[in-house]
């Protein structure tokens, strides 16, 4: 997952290479994007993963010992322990013009420990999103989405296979569009013929 998401939006657990991809990672990335929208610039524009971790801890504060349990690398844990103490910044002061509820949501999305980070359901119920979310008007997928399409003959698809499949899809779409256009043209011609008679 090192390259799944741009560094500036990577959750600490990705930077520390200690997590399977989870929804908590997406919540972190979404929090970074929301902060960027409010501040009109990236919140954590790290130059490399160490710089990225330093920027994160300067903004959200250094993690305490209990928040390091998910860090499986001793080296990474030692690095985090040696960081100078930094208390969390107040997002309301960081974004004084922003809706305080937006700042509250960002603060809950950008928690170092993925287990303590707000989840999707809590995000959707957050007062900042109240006007955008209606439980009674919630689209629901017919079936869980899988990424099985990424597998090809028992392994990950090569770049060439992806290109070939995209081209195949485009050709099929082109045929459908042309068929519909021909059908439409035929219907129009038929209508014109009846008008002439």
Task: Explain the meaning of each model-derived region.
Residues 1-14:
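Conserved activation segment of eukaryotic-like protein kinases, specifically the C-terminal portion
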Residues 2, 16-22, 44:
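Activation segment
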Residues 14, 37-38:
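Hydrophobic anchor on a C-lobe helix of Hanks-type protein kinase catalytic domains
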Residues 26:
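Conserved catalytic-loop aspartate of Hanks-type protein kinases
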Residues 60-108:
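C-terminal lobe substrate-recognition/regulatory segment of protein kinase catalytic domains
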Residues 117:
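Conserved HRD-motif arginine in the catalytic loop of eukaryotic-like protein kinases
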Residues 130-196:
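C-terminal intrinsically disordered, low-complexity extensions immediately downstream
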């Amino acid at each position: 997952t090192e390259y799944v998401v741009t560094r500036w939006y990577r959750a600490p657990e990705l930077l520390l290479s200690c997590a399977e991809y989870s929804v908590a990672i997406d919540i972190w990335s979404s929090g970074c994007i929301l902060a960027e929208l409010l501040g009109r610039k990236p919140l954590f524009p790290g130059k490399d993963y160490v710089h990225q971790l330093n920027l994160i801890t300067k903004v959200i504060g250094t993690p305490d010992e209990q928040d390091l349990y998910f860090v499986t690398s001793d080296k990474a844990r030692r690095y985090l322990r040696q960081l100078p103490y930094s208390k969390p910044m107040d997002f309301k002061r960081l974004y004084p013009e922003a809706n305080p509820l937006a700042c509250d949501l960002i603060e809950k999305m950008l928690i170092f420990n993925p287990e303590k980070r707000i989840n999707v359901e809590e995000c959707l119920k957050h007062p900042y999103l109240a006007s955008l979310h209606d439980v009674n008007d919630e689209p629901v997928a017919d079936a869980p989405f899988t990424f099985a399409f990424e597998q090809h003959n028992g392994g990950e698809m090569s770049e060439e296979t992806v290109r070939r499949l995209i081209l195949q899809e485009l050709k099929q779409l082109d045929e459908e569009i042309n068929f519909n256009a021909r059908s439409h043209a035929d219907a129009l011609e038929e209508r014109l013929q009846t008008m002439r008679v």
